[in-house]
Amino acid sequence: LARRQGLDVEGEASTREVTAHIRLPQGRTIGVGAFPISIAAKDFAAFTGEEKGDVAKLREELGSPRRIILGVDRLDYTKGILQRLTAFEELLDTGALDPEEVTLVQLATPSRERLDHYKATRSKVEEAVGRINGRFARVGHPVVHYQHRGVAKSLLRCYYRMADVMLVTPFKDGMNLVAKEYVACHDDGSGALVLSEFAGAADELNQAYLCNPFDIESVKAALLNALKALDDAPSTMTQRMLTMHQQVTEHDVQLWSQSFLGCLRQAEAQEAGA
């Protein structure tokens, strides 16, 4: 945009990264940078013996399925919830997934409920959940567990730790901290992450199974590949998760704030010395 205005710009910029200096006609220089936000990883990583017991109890309450898939989102049409439900249903329909062995848990936090578009999204999601359970569940054993309310952080950590596969499939997301929170909870290298290629977190969590959320076949393939790798290549999966865990813990919210404030201090010093 600055170049279109005819301003002198030094540096590089893309849809994901920017490091540039813009010189204004008055002689002032503006520095532009990208500072990907992160999480307080330590708050998610450490699990006490009691908390590990809570994780096991939660899994038991779900019927102790062989594999648990988890989605955690605001109930927002941009999060791709309906598309992941469609992908899950089609995998059950073709027999690629066994409803006796796999369960999908979708936690959907209420969001902008007064707006018609969000009301419609909720209606479609809940209709899909009912349809899938009507087709593939048996008494006392739903294949989709759906919750439309907020979840306390302590319980959310247990859900993260319990999940074998995390599904994060937004159509577009500047970052998506849910993906980082899930990875932070798996300091033992367990689990797998299926992540939208259009989430900002995909740049940092490049060991995830990336998918195009607009393409149901892409979501299905990524989910199946993640589940298959958990069975066939556990050591490889562990290394992938540990690599992402290291990324999240080393580039936490503290480093983010330090880098941001450091650039501000540097700019202040440069202006003072000008």
Which sequence ranges carry the predicted segments?
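Catalytic cores of carbohydrate-active enzymes across secretory and cytosolic contexts
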Residues: 1-274
